[in-house]
């Protein structure tokens, strides 16, 4: 929490100063009210009138400060929330492929939405409120001290009580807050799963399952929030009662002081208001300190800050000789190996195919080459250097991976191909031609600027794969790994794409296919046929 407050210190400081000044002026209004009362008791009309005008001006200043505080607080919260999401994104980028896929995308979505909302409610808003409440307490105590020193003493004692009592409950709220965060992430993931399966459930008439699933996930989320709220508010109510008892004690002290002529009668009205402000402020500080404890689990999830712990900045050397797979074994489960003592060699500029039934390790091999699955036995050499010496990010500077299930961003075809980079018209035309996408664009009125829809649902499966191939080609990756990347294409377009890839002398191609004709096999330098849990040589 402190990290983000410091990061956005200009707007945080401006909002805090406005809040402090506003609450300080509110205490001044109580002192002015004491003087107004004294003017009435003395029958001094002039003093009464002047104090009334002063009171109105003071309240005007309070309102102006609060308006300014709202402006600066809104900017500060926006910047801190943006910083939170940047750090969450940086944390995801620092995960390995395996680490990232250990969690559902719904859980990550929950962090970017629910977690940020919870932090805003339990950390940012309470922080600014505490600044005002603390100012109210400090200025109130100073005002009470100016009236009589005994009021200062009792105020300090009560302040200590109100500060230390909430600490008794911080651990409990931290535990409840952690459970709430986990429940929300799980619920969002379940709702996302139901939304993704909407068509399947409707097709089989499972409307009730959709409704009940959403209801169950929603209730789980709300139950966790309810438990957190009950704990927070229950503790807050207890603290409010302690504050009320303290306030009554001060009223009793005021009565004793007035009855003994130690302070004027006029002070009773204003002093009561100041005391109420002090104890309400203390109560607020206590309750909000508890809120900070509940927000801690959300901050604990953020372990990386954007701009820190940068990845290695040196690039991957251009492939000179080739990639060698030596005696590689791998299994997601130790008892069920997928690859056993694999040996393969992929020369620079060569064209290779991997064939075999499902589950024999074809896709697994590509992911090992990409550095996504480092837990294998044996060696994978990139020009005689172990690929473990490189990060996946470095390997992907020279490699591109096209899989059967293509993901497209909800933007235009152009943006999905270029990913925001600038390319010449010649580069674009070549990528469109070599990917067999040019023919599709000719039938689209908006051409490259055609929106693809959410997850590319405005395009056919074959069109999406052609966009993915064009994306890989235009970014000039010299090593292309294709995992059934032409499976959704008709035979004519598949032939066009594969012919273009096979004819490119600068491209090292490793292509997965379940079925290859003898004619097509002859066009590859080597075809590796895999069988489940076997070796290839």
Indicate residue ranges for each PLM-predicted region.
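Transmembrane helices of ABC transporter permease
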Residues: 7, 11-24, 55, 62, ...
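Cytosolic ends of transmembrane helices, especially the final helix of ABC transmembrane type-1 domains
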Residues: 206, 230, 274-305, 314
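An intracellular "coupling" helix at the cytosolic face of ABC transporter transmembrane type-1 domains
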Residues: 6, 97-98, 114-123, 127, ...
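ABC-family ATPase nucleotide-binding domain "signature/switch" substructure
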Residues: 405, 413-416, 450-537
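Juxtamembrane loop-to-helix connectors within ABC transporter transmembrane domains
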Residues: 93-138
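Transmembrane-helix motif of ABC transporter permease domains
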Residues: 10-29, 40-82, 266, 270
